[in-house]
Amino acid sequence: MARITVEDCLDKVENRFQLVLLASKRARVLARHPEEAKVTWDNDKPTVVALREIAEGHITPAYMKEKVKTDRYPIERPMPAPRDDLADLDDDI
């Protein structure tokens, strides 16, 4: 697992500031939707995968203008069933 460097990515974007914005936007998408990765994960974090995608040319500065899939609201999880050992506590009050 080779580490990615900023110099690898700067060939694809104009400056470091644009690189930060591009990588952070892509990393947020990858954190919520890991199946959309254009490179293999190799047990990396979303930020590393985003930088690898930029270095390999899969993600370009045009990505900043694209609308991305976001989940504005958290996933609703079902409430857990009441435990039997806690059901008798209401009777004691």
Curated annotation (Swiss-Prot):
Top-rank taxon, per record: Bacteria
UniProt EC number: 2.7.7.6
GO biological process terms, semicolon-separated: DNA-templated transcription
Gene Ontology MF terms: DNA binding; DNA-directed RNA polymerase activity
InterPro entries assigned: DNA-dir_RNA_pol_omega (IPR003716), Pol_omega/Rpo6/RPB6 (IPR006110), RPB6/omega-like_sf (IPR036161)
Coiled coil, from the record: none
Keywords: DNA-directed RNA polymerase, Nucleotidyltransferase, Transcription, Transferase
Catalytic activity: RNA(n) + a ribonucleoside 5'-triphosphate = RNA(n+1) + diphosphate
Region (Disordered): 74-93
Pfam assignment, any one: RNA_pol_Rpb6
Gene3D superfamilies registered for this protein in UniProt: 3.90.940.10
Record-level GO cellular component terms: DNA-directed RNA polymerase complex
Keyword tRNA-binding: no
SMART domains registered for this protein in UniProt: RNA_pol_Rpb6
Function comment: Promotes RNA polymerase assembly. Latches the N- and C-terminal regions of the beta' subunit thereby facilitating its interaction with the beta and alpha subunits.
NCBIfam families, per database record: rpoZ
Protein family according to the UniProt entry: Belongs to the RNA polymerase subunit omega family.
UniProt subunit comment: The RNAP catalytic core consists of 2 alpha, 1 beta, 1 beta' and 1 omega subunit. When a sigma factor is associated with the core the holoenzyme is formed, which can initiate transcription.
Protein name: DNA-directed RNA polymerase subunit omega
Organism encoding this protein: Methylococcus capsulatus (strain ATCC 33009 / NCIMB 11132 / Bath)
Lineage: Bacteria, Pseudomonadati, Pseudomonadota, Gammaproteobacteria, Methylococcales
